[in-house]
């Protein structure tokens, strides 16, 4: 079973479902809608274009393995060339620098996160449960991709921004806007429903940023600083939920945690939206 689940994940990470825009990296079901998923059957690409797209996916996956083993700082074009079956010239046809490769990995990561967030939009619950569902999705993604989930910081460092291609920078910014727009819509819907109120100093922008900060910080520390005494003494598997609840209670986002069992919500999101990912994580003990 472990081998089977891992094989499924490797397949969709490698783009075997036909890869044009990486929308299906962590979606365990390749749907028929090619325009939506980027499936090869209706991608509209020529064989040569598809081969180029597939090769780029392969190179991104190799770069991902190198980063997981050695870290972002130790990634080089020479190492990527050695790990692949392609010449350095061919690799430079895809990426103008190692920073461009890093940005491609960050785009890969953000698209994967966006897929998880898209699932949570359809969760059957109140507005606060929907924001909790986003926290669940991000938590699961961070457990599956502890290295790539930190890309948000790496992608914004000057040494990456200065040397990455403008096209990839534009794509990353566009993706960020899409994710932010979805989060803004959720917050604004909560206000319209009467579950949340803005204050003169706090609007949707501040609330979205606060939730991202809680999610990113909590997961980054849990994944990368597990030996810290501050983290070791916390044995509760719902620690990320508690952090989110403290923020949301402080904002007065109803129902408050004293009025609703959000642990039950968290478990329901895992079961209804991410059962396959949870099953995989359990088999690899993460």
Region spans (language model):
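C-terminal peripheral helix-coil segments that are non-catalytic and often amphipathic
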Residues: 3-43, 181, 185-193, 217-286
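Short glycine/proline-centered loop/turn elements that form peptide/ligand docking sites
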Residues: 30, 40-48, 65, 74-76, ...
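Alpha-helical structural segments
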Residues: 54, 58-65, 69, 83, ...
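Helix-turn-helix
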Residues: 70-100, 104
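Amphipathic alpha-helical packing segments from all-alpha helical-bundle domains
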Residues: 117-118, 163-195, 204-220, 237-245
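Amphipathic alpha-helical segments that line or abut small-molecule/effector binding pockets
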Residues: 128-147, 209, 241, 245
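Amphipathic alpha-helical segments used for helix-helix packing
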Residues: 144-167, 220-224
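Short, hydrophobic secondary-structure boundary micro-motifs
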Residues: 150-153, 198-200, 224, 257-260
């Amino acid at each position: 079973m472990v081998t089977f689940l891992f094989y499924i994940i490797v397949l969709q990470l490698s783009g075997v479902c036909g890869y044009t825009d990486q929308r299906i990296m962590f979606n365990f079901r390749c749907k028929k809608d090619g325009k939506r998923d980027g499936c090869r059957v209706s991608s509209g690409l020529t064989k040569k274009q598809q081969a180029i797209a597939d090769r780029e996916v392969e190179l991104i996956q190799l770069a991902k393995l190198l980063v997981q083993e050695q870290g972002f700082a130790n990634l080089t074009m020479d190492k990527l060339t050695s790990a692949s079956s392609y010449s350095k010239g061919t690799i430079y046809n895809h990426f103008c620098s190692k920073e461009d490769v890093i940005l491609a990995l960050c785009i890969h990561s953000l698209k994967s996160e966006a897929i998880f967030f898209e699932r949570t939009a359809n969760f059957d619950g109140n507005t606060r449960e929907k924001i909790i569902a986003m926290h669940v999705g991000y938590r699961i993604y961070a457990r599956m991709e502890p290295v790539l989930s930190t890309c948000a910081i790496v992608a914004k460092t000057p040494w990456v921004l200065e040397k990455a291609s403008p096209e990839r920078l534009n794509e990353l910014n566009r993706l960020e806007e899409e994710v932010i727009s979805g989060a803004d819509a959720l917050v604004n819907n909560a206000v319209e429903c009467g579950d949340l109120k803005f204050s003169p100093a706090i609007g949707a922008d501040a609330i979205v940023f606060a939730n991202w900060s809680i999610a990113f910080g909590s997961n980054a520390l849990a994944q990368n600083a597990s030996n810290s005494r501050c983290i070791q003494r916390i044995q509760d598997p719902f620690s990320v939920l508690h952090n989110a609840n403290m923020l949301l209670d402080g904002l007065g986002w109803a129902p408050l945690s004293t009025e609703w069992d959000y642990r039950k919500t968290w478990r329901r999101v895992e079961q209804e939206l991410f059962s396959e990912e949870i099953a995989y994580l359990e088999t690899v003990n993460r």
